[in-house]
Amino acid sequence: MARNDKNDKNEQTDGLVERLVTVDRVAKVVKGGRIFSFTALTVVGDGNGRVGFGRGKAREVPAAIQKALEAAKRNMITVELNDATLYHPIKARHGASKVYMQPASEGTGVIAGGAMRAVLEVAGVKDVLTKCYGSTNTANVVRATFNGLRDMSTPEKMAAKRGKSVDEILG
């Protein structure tokens, strides 16, 4: 199986940063042999807390990428950020992929692997420390990162949920 990672491909359309995470060639085995097609995984974001991911599959690479981008734009969520980092450490998983993300001080940068880096950068996270455990399947790592960002809560939300003030939560 051929794998072509193209993390350096960034395009800007309608204010969204599009990042191609991976393109894979897949095969369907039929009576007469194999039918090859391509799957693409993309992430899009506005660099200010909105992020989405999508997968597309087609017989040609450009068509698969286009389908993935359309799916990513439909699948966008809003992530509340603490300036350019996270509010608190996050553990998330999808399948056998587990990710850990921790807020970092200003100037640290995005310390992350390829798939996680793509999601965090298009979301607008500038300073974060991350680690991926278990399966490093690109699609599952992207989904786990996405789940973690979606489930992150602000101190205001935590305080309201617990019936306390923000000062009590932050200690």
From Swiss-Prot:
Gene3D superfamilies registered for this protein in UniProt: 3.30.160.20, 3.30.230.10
Gene Ontology terms: biological process: translation
Name of this chain's protein: Small ribosomal subunit protein uS5
Record keywords: Ribonucleoprotein, Ribosomal protein, RNA-binding, rRNA-binding
Organism of this sequence: Psychrobacter arcticus (strain DSM 17307 / VKM B-2377 / 273-4)
Domain-level remarks: The N-terminal domain interacts with the head of the 30S subunit; the C-terminal domain interacts with the body and contacts protein S4. The interaction surface between S4 and S5 is involved in control of translational fidelity.
Superkingdom of origin: Bacteria
UniProt domain S5 DRBM: residue ranges: 16-79
An example Gene Ontology CC term for this record: small ribosomal subunit
Phylogenetic classification of the source organism: Bacteria, Pseudomonadati, Pseudomonadota, Gammaproteobacteria, Moraxellales
Molecular functions per Gene Ontology: rRNA binding; structural constituent of ribosome
Record's keyword annotation contains Ribosomal protein: yes
Family recorded in the similarity comment: Belongs to the universal ribosomal protein uS5 family.
